[in-house]
């Protein structure tokens, strides 16, 4: 999931430099959402991990 966030971030940067502001905005929003989902799942897995 973190890989997808990085891909959308790169797409947003490239689209922004080429002048496609709509595509850049959408790609950066998707990258932010995926990164937040990744962080939430990371915290949940750390807190709810199995303890022996």
Curated annotation (Swiss-Prot):
Key words, A-Z: Cell membrane, Membrane, Transmembrane, Transmembrane helix
A Pfam family of this chain: DUF1328
Subcellular location per the Swiss-Prot or TrEMBL entry: Cell membrane
TM spans (from-to): 4-24, 29-49
Mode of membrane association: Multi-pass membrane protein
Cellular component annotations (GO), alphabetically ordered: plasma membrane
Claim: Transmembrane is one of the keywords in the record: yes
Primary localization class, coarse: membrane
Family, per entry: Belongs to the UPF0391 family.
Name of this protein: UPF0391 membrane protein Tgr7_2500
Protein species of origin: Thioalkalivibrio sulfidiphilus (strain HL-EbGR7)
